[in-house]
Amino acid sequence: MAFFSPWKLSSQKLGFFLVTFGFIWGMMLLHFTIQQRTQPESSSMLREQILDLSKRYIKALAEENRNVVDGPYAGVMTAYDLKKTLAVLLDNILQRIGKLESKVDNLVNGTGANSTNSTTAVPSLVSLEKINVADIINGVQEKCVLPPMDGYPHCEGKIKWMKDMWRSDPCYADYGVDGTSCSFFIYLSEVENWCPRLPWRAKNPYEEADHNSLAEIRTDFNILYGMMKKHEEFRWMRLRIRRMADAWIQAIKSLAEKQNLEKRKRKKILVHLGLLTKESGFKIAETAFSGGPLGELVQWSDLITSLYLLGHDIRISASLAELKEIMKKVVGNRSGCPTVGDRIVELIYIDIVGLAQFKKTLGPSWVHYQCMLRVLDSFGTEPEFNHASYAQSKGHKTPWGKWNLNPQQFYTMFPHTPDNSFLGFVVEQHLNSSDIHHINEIKRQNQSLVYGKVDSFWKNKKIYLDIIHTYMEVHATVYGSSTKNIPSYVKNHGILSGRDLQFLLRETKLFVGLGFPYEGPAPLEAIANGCAFLNPKFNPPKSSKNTDFFIGKPTLRELTSQHPYAEVFIGRPHVWTVDLNNREEVEDAVKAILNQKIEPYMPYEFTCEGMLQRINAFIEKQDFCHGQVMWPPLSALQVKLAEPGQSCKQVCQESQLICEPSFFQHLNKEKDLLKYKVICQSSELYKDILVPSFYPKSKHCVFQGDLLLFSCAGAHPTHQRICPCRDFIKGQVALCKDCL
């Protein structure tokens, strides 16, 4: 929305104008009366003089109000009020000129009836140029031709809402909304960004000012260390950043050489770690040094580091008091419209716990910040659980879903849910330069290392481990006094430092999965050190339908193995996915691993540089506040028809592609499908995660009636799902080949 300094037509200025104008008018009328008998003056000259005076006055006012946008929708007391006033004055003047013109013609040429020269009635100049004052005052003459709404799928729905609800809050009228479609469109394009901007509208001065602030990469951590030093909760993350500092700085310099990091807007970013607040009840920071879960802390520390090195302004919050202090400008604002002026934040990275805290803190203002949210969500949130009313209709009782965000605003640990965005983390290399030289000299021993630091993970796995022990030694890093489930032949090293673990992995040929924990970082670390990973297969796949661990999580995703990412995106010779209960399959895999020689392998997306590249692309390209920005580019779209019983995720994956949910909107009309030779004899709208779809027998198409329900997950029993797939960069799954 454009914001302007209000202009008021003061009574003194108006009075001076009217007195001056009246005096000059009277003198000219007297002069005309005296002179008309001896030297008839042309009425057009008189008209020119009057209009010239008016033009000079209007020009002076225009200079005074140079930055004011005209129109009935620019807000109250702007130049449009002047336009209404002058419309009345000029209409009165033109009417008087018309009467004088008629009298002069009669005096000079005689009456129209006696005129000998006139053969055809000449239209009066006044009638040709007459202004409809009522139209000007009512704004009727303000033509509002709406631009195409392609790429703004929510625009039409928002306009319908405004027609019914614009009187529900006086703030809409303050922004110039007056009940007309044009005023709705201007508000929704300039204030809330749901619609395309009208081409004749001036740009928001605050938006233009924002672009003057550019991001510059950072190559030291001094400022970040100072920020994080204030929080004891950040101790583990701070130590991780220090250990990896050299690798991070080398990575940002390398990325800057490979792609242009100039002319990027410096964003104001809030990072709120809800899981570290006292109110959350979690003890993650306290248990980080005693065997507690580290996955979330790893991801948060890598995210904060990336945002900082990319040159953005970040503010970190780990308490409700800090959150309230940062957002104090909008806390308590009950208006349905956004706060005017400079933005407090432009992006918000948060977790599910923090999301509830943020919504409660902001109150009604929450709605204006929803599009800025990026939610760290390890296991992902599928559209079926994100859509509140749909989740309720399906009987889902998860406490983690029903946020009604764009599903791509949820950021996952691995690229397992294509409806979400893959944030990831960095696999740490715990070695210094002298270690790296030494580690390359280490010879691999005929030994394996079991992935499972808790005794309970080993339960009922002895037969499986016995097979492995037949061919090689079995080592472990189990902590705690309980070892009842660990076979006697296992050599247990206890808890090791990261550096010592790296050396142990370099001596090891096989990293052995037990089936739990699911989707952890350790297998990637082992593969990066040259181990092969024995990845347990799940048949049937594990999900919330058959596994307690997943009950309550906002996903129906099915895990086909302990580590689906390693299974799908890495594979052999680094990853061998086997059925633990199939002795022959396990033996064959172990023998093959012993007979092969493989080099260490690290997917680019799990390196410092890969994460910097991915996060920078998301910051620059992902935009959920301005309609549907076209990213990834449409050039990456490849359309596939799934067979009945097959999801879009599956059909894309079979073709070595990724399902891309942002492309669904381009497959949601009959004319869209014609490009891909899908002809609809009939069609309907339906609100469900399984559409758009096609029934080949009757050539019936079903299109999506609710944009939040577009989903790569879910299979239709009889219809073919119409699926948007895209390619991806090997080692950088989140990005298509044309995305950078």
UniProtKB/Swiss-Prot annotation:
UniProt modification remark: N-glycosylated. A secreted form is released from the membrane after cleavage by gamma-secretase.
Transmembrane segments: 14-30
Membrane topology: Single-pass type II membrane protein
Pathway(s) served: Protein modification; protein glycosylation
Pfam families xrefs: Glyco_transf_18, MGT5A_N
Catalytic reactions of this protein: N(4)-{beta-D-GlcNAc-(1->2)-[beta-D-GlcNAc-(1->4)]-alpha-D-Man-(1->3)-[beta-D-GlcNAc-(1->2)-alpha-D-Man-(1->6)]-beta-D-Man-(1->4)-beta-D-GlcNAc-(1->4)-beta-D-GlcNAc}-L-asparaginyl-[protein] + UDP-N-acetyl-alpha-D-glucosamine = N(4)-{beta-D-GlcNAc-(1->2)-[beta-D-GlcNAc-(1->4)]-alpha-D-Man-(1->3)-[beta-D-GlcNAc-(1->2)-[beta-D-GlcNAc-(1->6)]-alpha-D-Man-(1->6)]-beta-D-Man-(1->4)-beta-D-GlcNAc-(1->4)-beta-D-GlcNAc}-L-asparaginyl-[protein] + UDP + H(+)
Topology Lumenal: residue spans: 31-740
Protein name: Alpha-1,6-mannosylglycoprotein 6-beta-N-acetylglucosaminyltransferase A
Species the sequence originates in: Rattus norvegicus
Gene name per UniProt: Mgat5
